[in-house]
């Protein structure tokens, strides 16, 4: 469902229609609606910040950002962010999108759970993270009007238990490869769900390396 919020909408193109269809068919309704909301929050953030970006590519980055959590795109040993980025890369390459744009979308997905870095990079990279941080963490909640938030949620519902359901979805998507959470926020997800989880400690890795000193 495409809506127009203060001039922001999903571009009606063959590329975006295919993206919508692929994500709807591959991801759960929870992830599909989450990713759709991420696009609107990201695009509105871009509007407020006066950033220039390609709306089709932003839509791709937002919609594919959690595809690494799906069975179809989840690898055995890569971070889920990389899996999603690789899925987007394969899709865009099949449509002969230029390599620079593919690389930008790849980075926007790969870095979307890395706080403090994306906002200093290409607008598309910054905005995918901005959308995710708004929908999952609510970090910029006051920056959107009640009307904007409600319109987005009406079109793409959060449901009554989104907070717990998204944490569970994260866990289900990464529990088979907990080693990929070293040094990133998803270690908190594993720890929340698995009391036996013993995350790698950065200082311990240093001290236990094969170096003599």
Question: What is each of the regions a protein language model found here?
Answer:
Residues 2-6, 26-32, 36-51, 97, ...:
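Divalent metal-dependent phosphate-bond-processing catalytic cores, especially two-metal-ion Mg2+/Mn2+ enzymes
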Residues 2-20:
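Short alpha-helical hairpin
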Residues 11, 33-34, 53-57:
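N-terminal glycine-rich anion-binding loops that anchor highly charged ligand groups
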Residues 15-34, 67-72:
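Active-site flanking loop/helix segments enriched in acidic
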Residues 28, 48-56, 72-80, 99:
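Alpha-helix boundary/capping segments in eukaryotic regulatory proteins
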Residues 38, 79-94:
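An active-site-proximal "capping" alpha-helix that borders the catalytic cofactor pocket
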Residues 55-74, 84, 106-115:
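His-Asp-centered metal-binding catalytic motifs of divalent-metal-dependent phosphohydrolases/nucleases
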Residues 89, 93-108, 118-122:
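Internal catalytic or translocation cores that form aromatic/hydrophobic pockets or channels
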């Amino acid at each position: 469902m495409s809506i127009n919020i203060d001039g922001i909408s999903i571009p009606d193109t063959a590329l975006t229609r295919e993206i919508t269809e692929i994500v709807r068919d591959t991801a759960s309704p929870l992830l599909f609606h989450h990713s759709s909301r991420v696009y609107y929050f990201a695009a509105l953030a871009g509007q407020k910040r006066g950033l220039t970006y390609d709306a089709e590519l932003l839509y791709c980055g937002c919609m594919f950002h959690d595809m690494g959590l799906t069975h179809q795109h989840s690898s055995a040993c890569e971070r889920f962010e990389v899996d999603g980025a690789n899925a987007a890369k394969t899709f865009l390459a099949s449509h002969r999108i230029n390599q620079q744009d593919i690389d930008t979308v790849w980075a926007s997905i790969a870095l979307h759970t890395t706080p403090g870095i994306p906002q200093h990079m290409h607008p598309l990279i910054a905005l995918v993270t901005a959308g995710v941080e708004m929908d999952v963490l609510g970090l910029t909640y006051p920056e959107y009007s009640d009307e904007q938030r409600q319109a987005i949620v009406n079109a793409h519902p959060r449901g009554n238990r989104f907070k717990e359901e998204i944490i569970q979805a994260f866990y289900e998507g990464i529990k088979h490869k907990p080693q990929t959470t070293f040094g990133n926020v998803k270690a908190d997800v594993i720890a929340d769900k698995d009391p036996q989880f013993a995350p790698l400690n950065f200082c311990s890795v240093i001290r236990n390396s094969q170096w003599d000193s």
